């Protein structure tokens, strides 16, 4: 009988950097290697990625990486895993493979293409990896041809699904194969691992509230000028709907995102969208068009940055006209409300009509009834919700309990908590891995301790004060000269001069308080140096708080000359 372990390196009690590890006996399967972009401004932090230390220590056992829904939250840290640990085979859909290759071609993933081993899986075709049978199946999600995975073990199936909805539309791009895979898995599913989606936030099924054709037609049909539509690059469903409207209304169609242009071309090549009579033009022709539909699409952080530039007339291609119409199609995401409000203010200032459909149209994720259908059909012994906050997991549990699930069936895990199932029985003891997620800034990978993030917040909000003190080794004494640098500290000149005077008095007092800074070797000992720098930092911080109500980051250093 199989011994199974499951744990998350990211994605639990957070939205993003999804990364899950499944151990079946001695074999390891990784699901997703995503990244997270901070929704609040943290100075210099571009993204946060999982801690891959465990994978590095066990890389010989890793059989592959499985990516069913190829969005940033699921593949955004691929290059960092490959550079810090090594290359592993990737198993994904043809669309997923296209997205990964496109990002590599644009150098968004700093990976040599010839080192990649990407396996494009075919739906419902079982593959064998190290004596394990794995069956991919299509699920209806925001990207075409998204996959769920069913792994067969001696104890029953383990089913992994990121996002899905129950959908019976005859749309080959967003085909749902749950009805075909369920008979194979029903009554023999040991573990269901599934994204929490909209469960607990939206009762009923997600469909038809995810559809946008009617709302978009209502806005676009009477509009005389250009139509700008902003949406995340994970929302291919809406982009394809806009292309359909452009074709029906004989409007030129523009996608302002080179990576999404590649994805759209792949979708067309795979005959997932009929582009006959669709007039697609490049973004360079935007100013020659009077009635085009322009899709502005990127990951959330880059999309908002792009919209800011356009709103401030700093974009090299787009200038708003009074005849334009703007449509927001981004879902409500905690942390982005203020940014979104600022962008809409910029649009209004340009006298452009705008509409916000983000509250009307649901993202393509499971709602209450979708999840109830999946659970009641598969009848899993255990269920693990993923990809959400703790409160989402609690709501998920309440919804499924109302549908008849038992409390002990639903297992809530935090990052690093290791769940063990042996002979179909859950081990009541949870081991825990110590994880240290990394942040990516302009200098590359950095540690992400609480103190580091706090200091970055300080720098972004109040600036930095650098204090340099000089120590003469020959005379074994401090010089009177002290150098100050104020970076990003908003103070007028008289206030700054007054602060410098007070700071100098404080620092000289701190120096005088240290009586044993000289040694036989006529140098400052490490402990004395550290004590002095900490003392100066505290004193200057208190001074700033009292005199300015600001709290900049204080950096003090001692230079021996």
Curated annotation (Swiss-Prot):
Signal sequence, start to end: none
Family matches, as SUPFAM superfamilies: Metallo-hydrolase/oxidoreductase
Keyword flag Transmembrane helix: yes
Membrane topology designation: Multi-pass membrane protein
GO terms assigned for molecular function: metal ion binding; RNA binding
Positions of disulphide bridges: none
Cellular component terms (Gene Ontology): plasma membrane
InterPro entries: RibonucZ/Hydroxyglut_hydro, RNase_J, RNase_J_2, RNase_J_b_CASP, RNase_J_C
The keyword Metal-binding is annotated on this UniProt entry: no
Cell compartments where the protein resides: Cell membrane
Name of the protein in its database record: Uncharacterized protein MG423
Annotated organism of origin: Mycoplasma genitalium (strain ATCC 33530 / DSM 19775 / NCTC 10195 / G37)
């Amino acid at each position: 009988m199989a011994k199974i372990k499951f744990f998350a390196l990211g994605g639990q009690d957070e939205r993003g950097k999804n990364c899950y590890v499944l151990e079946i006996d001695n074999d390891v399967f990784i699901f997703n290697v995503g990244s997270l972009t901070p929704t609040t401004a943290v100075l210099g932090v571009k993204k946060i990625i999982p801690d891959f230390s465990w994978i590095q220590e066990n890389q010989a056992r890793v059989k592959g990486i499985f990516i069913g829904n190829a969005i940033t939250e699921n593949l955004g840290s691929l290059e960092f895993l490959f550079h810090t640990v090594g290359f592993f085979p990737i198993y994904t859909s043809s669309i997923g493979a296209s997205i990964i290759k496109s990002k590599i071609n644009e150098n968004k993933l700093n990976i040599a293409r010839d080192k990649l081993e990407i396996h494009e899986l075919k739906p419902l075709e079982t593959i064998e990896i190290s004596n394990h049978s794995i069956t991919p199946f299509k699920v209806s999600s925001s990207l075409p041809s998204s996959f769920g995975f069913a792994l067969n073990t001696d104890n029953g199936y383990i089913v992994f699904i990121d996002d899905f909805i129950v959908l019976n539309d005859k749309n080959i791009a967003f085909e749902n194969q749950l009805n075909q895979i369920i008979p194979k898995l029903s009554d023999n599913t040991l573990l269901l691992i599934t994204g929490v989606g909209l469960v607990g936030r939206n009762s009923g099924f997600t469909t038809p509230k995810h559809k946008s054709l009617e709302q978009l037609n209502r806005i676009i049909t009477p509009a005389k000028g250009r139509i700008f539509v902003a949406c995340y690059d994970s929302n291919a469903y809406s982009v394809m709907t806009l292309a359909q409207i452009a074709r029906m209304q004989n409007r030129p169609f523009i996608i302002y995102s080179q990576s999404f242009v590649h994805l759209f071309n792949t979708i067309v090549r795979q005959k997932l969208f009929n582009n006959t009579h669709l007039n697609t033009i490049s973004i360079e022709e935007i100013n020659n068009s009077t009635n085009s539909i322009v899709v502005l699409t990127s990951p959330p952080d880059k999309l908002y940055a792009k919209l800011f530039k356009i709103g401030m007339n700093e974009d090299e291609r787009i200038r708003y006209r009074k005849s334009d119409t703007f449509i927001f199609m981004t879902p409500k995401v905690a942390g982005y409300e203020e940014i979104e409000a600022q962008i809409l203010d910029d649009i209004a200032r340009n006298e452009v009509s705008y509409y916000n459909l983000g509250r009307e149209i649901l993202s393509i994720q499971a709602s209450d009834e979708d999840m109830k259908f999946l659970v009641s059909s598969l009848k899993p012994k255990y269920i693990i919700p993923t990809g959400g906050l703790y409160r989402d997991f609690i709501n998920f549990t309440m919804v499924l309990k109302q549908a008849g699930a038992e409390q002990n069936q639903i297992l809530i895990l935090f990052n690093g908590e290791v769940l063990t199932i042996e002979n179909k029985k859950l081990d009541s003891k949870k081991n825990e891995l110590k994880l240290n997620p990394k942040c990516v800034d302009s200098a590359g990978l950095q540690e992400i301790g609480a103190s580091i993030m706090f200091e970055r917040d300080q720098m972004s909000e109040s600036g930095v004060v650098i204090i340099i003190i000089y120590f003469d080794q020959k005379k074994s004494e401090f010089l009177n000269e002290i150098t100050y640098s104020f970076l990003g500290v908003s103070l007028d000149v008289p206030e700054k001069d007054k602060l410098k005077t007070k700071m100098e008095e404080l620092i000289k007092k701190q120096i005088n308080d240290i009586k044993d800074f000289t040694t036989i070797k006529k140098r400052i000992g490490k402990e004395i140096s550290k004590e002095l720098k900490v003392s100066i930092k505290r004193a200057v911080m208190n001074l700033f708080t009292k005199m300015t109500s600001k709290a900049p980051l204080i950096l003090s250093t001692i230079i021996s000359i």
